[in-house]
């Protein structure tokens, strides 16, 4: 019968190798097992052979395997990169110094001193005063709605008027008065409509 012997690598990935039982007992030459990428020669064992212990689950070993692989790759790649790094770092240092020198005068040009700024207040430039030619402060305009005067004679009438009072103002016709009858209110609302033309053919 053939038995399975698990050869565990150092990086944690279980490798399987099928070896005949009779081949081990008879000593059929040296068998080569690959461990960690290196070939090792192992002499055949004589005597009673035992089954290898069961391997751990692949998930846990796989995690360890990837970590070990990454460390192996970093160890392998560290050798040739060590020679290139000093020249690259020197280039970086020169670039950094050039950038630092160029950035200092650029900041002065981009941001002038704050003392040279004039504070801007929009209210300083907005004046709501009329010019002296059109001053109307001497007119009694309290309570007067906005009016557009076309002629000078209307302006003279305004000068002759006294201060406006709500008692003397006539009431508009659409305001309802409690003393008026409904018929009088309706008479104020009557509007003459054009006559109806019945001659139009439909």
Swiss-Prot record:
Effect after changing residue 165 to A: Abolishes phosphorylation
One GO biological process term: cell division
Keyword Nucleus: yes
Main location: cytoplasm
Motif, TEK-box 1: chain positions: 71-73
Motif placement: SH3-binding: 163-173
Keywords (A to Z) from UniProt: Acetylation, Cell cycle, Cell division, Chromosome partition, Cytoplasm, DNA damage, DNA repair, Mitosis, Nucleus, Phosphoprotein, Proto-oncogene, Repeat, SH3-binding, Ubl conjugation
Subcellular location: Cytoplasm; Nucleus
UniProt remark on domains: The N-terminal destruction box (D-box) acts as a recognition signal for degradation via the ubiquitin-proteasome pathway.
One GO location term (cellular component): cytosol
Tissue specificity of this protein: Expressed at low level in most tissues, except in adult testis, where it is highly expressed. Overexpressed in many patients suffering from pituitary adenomas, primary epithelial neoplasias, and esophageal cancer.
UniProt function note: Regulatory protein, which plays a central role in chromosome stability, in the p53/TP53 pathway, and DNA repair. Probably acts by blocking the action of key proteins. During the mitosis, it blocks Separase/ESPL1 function, preventing the proteolysis of the cohesin complex and the subsequent segregation of the chromosomes. At the onset of anaphase, it is ubiquitinated, conducting to its destruction and to the liberation of ESPL1. Its function is however not limited to a blocking activity, since it is required to activate ESPL1.
Residues recorded with modification N-acetylalanine: 2
List of residues that carry Phosphoserine: 165
Quaternary structure and partners: Interacts with RPS10 and DNAJA1. Interacts with the caspase-like ESPL1, and prevents its protease activity probably by covering its active site. Interacts with TP53 and blocks its activity probably by blocking its binding to DNA. Interacts with the Ku 70 kDa subunit of ds-DNA kinase. Interacts with PTTG1IP.
PANTHER family named among the record's database cross-references: SECURIN (PTHR10418:SF7), SECURIN-3 (PTHR10418)
Name of protein: Securin
Origin superkingdom: Eukaryota
Highest classification ranks of the organism: Eukaryota, Metazoa, Chordata, Craniata, Vertebrata
UniProt similarity note: Belongs to the securin family.
Keyword Ubl conjugation: yes
Segments carrying motif TEK-box 2: 94-96
Residue window of motif D-box: 61-64
